[in-house]
Amino acid sequence: PEEVIAGASALVLSSYLVRCKEGEPMKAATLQAIEYAKKHDVPVVLTLGTKYVIADNPQWWRDFLKENVTILAMNEDEALELTGLSDPLTASDMALEWVDLVLCTAGPNGLYMAGYTEEANKRQTQHPLLPGHIAEFNRYEFSRAMRREHCENPLRVYSHIAPYMGGPEKIMNTNGAGDGALSALLHDIAANGYHRHNVPNSSKH
């Protein structure tokens, strides 16, 4: 129902929901849910699910993202099919042409994030600057992510989260890492919305 989506912190979808056979109701129901989310300014979150779904028609997905999606979650294989770029950082950067925030897992190499912040509010990192296809890409990694449309002077910001090395010396399996990262992000979105509702004048928003 529309009122459920209207009161939600986010609408989370998988790519499978819109790539079904002609005439099946799942796609129409998903698109209706997206329209409700857009109507009530609820962020739409999409997980790409598998590279094979994306490889079938990458341009269709690019158009779908630009029209409907706020936050994109993917792994490096899905990112390659979507953008044609094998580097997860530059693939995430390209995806910012279509969405406001990107999470891209890179197997045992950790997680990349890319998003927008207001130029005037950028926050310098206290960590060492990292090399990459975008030089010193983590310079403003402490900045608060914003929707691009809410920025007067949008600035792209990036970060990298390395794997936690308190466990095994060699990471053998990263299944579920992206789901865990997305869960943390969704928790932050929900907590921020709850705090904004209950303490509307807080400087933390």
Located regions from the model:
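Ribokinase/PfkB-type carbohydrate-kinase core domain
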Residues: 1-168, 190-201
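Hydrophobic transmembrane alpha-helices
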Residues: 183-191
